[in-house]
């Protein structure tokens, strides 16, 4: 039986109730924590990665911007873990849903913009009008800059959705081709299976990179407004 190409992107249900909530709550449970003074290698590596990422993102921020550090670290860990779990066979990836990505992008973007308008109102308004703009073009440029400002959360969500969805579709197509040719052409099957393994490794990197890019862009929006 041929499976629908987009079947893996349909949110699963349990007894008619959406299971996406349980899937979203799963990543925090997989992050190991330690109650001991001496940590094992896994927790030590995890703490090192968190400190390295935090240093990369928060160096450019002032004291007000650094108050967001905990939220940004939670965001990158959540997205990365969710993306990696979605690479498991017969699993569901919440970040392929535009609605969920918008639910993450809009509040974070709105919080950063609101912070800018509250603390630096003049500077925030100055972003809507580039310096040296000719007087006849001022109304048009203000409208364009305002539209581009409101497009930012949509661009964040669409970028994450498109990259994760494209990778899953490509893996699904190559996996289906491998299965279909396994009984007819063994040499070609081995070649395609090797390509599938390489693509899976690439998708693991993409899952981590997209989590970093999403969080980094939120951090840049915050930096512009603090």
From Swiss-Prot:
Classification via InterPro entries: ATP_synth_F0_asu, ATP_synth_F0_asu_AS, ATP_synth_F0_asu_bact/mt, F0_ATP_A_sf
Disulfide pairings: none
Domain of life: Eukaryota
GO CC annotation: mitochondrial inner membrane; proton-transporting ATP synthase complex
Gene3D superfamilies assigned: ATP synthase, F0 complex, subunit A
Annotated membrane topology: Multi-pass membrane protein
Catalyzed reaction equations: H(+)(in) = H(+)(out)
PROSITE patterns, alphabetized: ATPASE_A (PS00449)
Pfam family, one: ATP-synt_A
One Gene Ontology MF term: proton channel activity
Single GO BP term: proton transmembrane transport
Subunit (UniProt): Component of the ATP synthase complex composed at least of ATP5F1A/subunit alpha, ATP5F1B/subunit beta, ATP5MC1/subunit c (homooctomer), MT-ATP6/subunit a, MT-ATP8/subunit 8, ATP5ME/subunit e, ATP5MF/subunit f, ATP5MG/subunit g, ATP5MK/subunit k, ATP5MJ/subunit j, ATP5F1C/subunit gamma, ATP5F1D/subunit delta, ATP5F1E/subunit epsilon, ATP5PF/subunit F6, ATP5PB/subunit b, ATP5PD/subunit d, ATP5PO/subunit OSCP.
Protein known as: ATP synthase F(0) complex subunit a
Organism whose genome encodes this protein: Gorilla gorilla gorilla (Western lowland gorilla)
Lineage: Eukaryota, Metazoa, Chordata, Craniata, Vertebrata
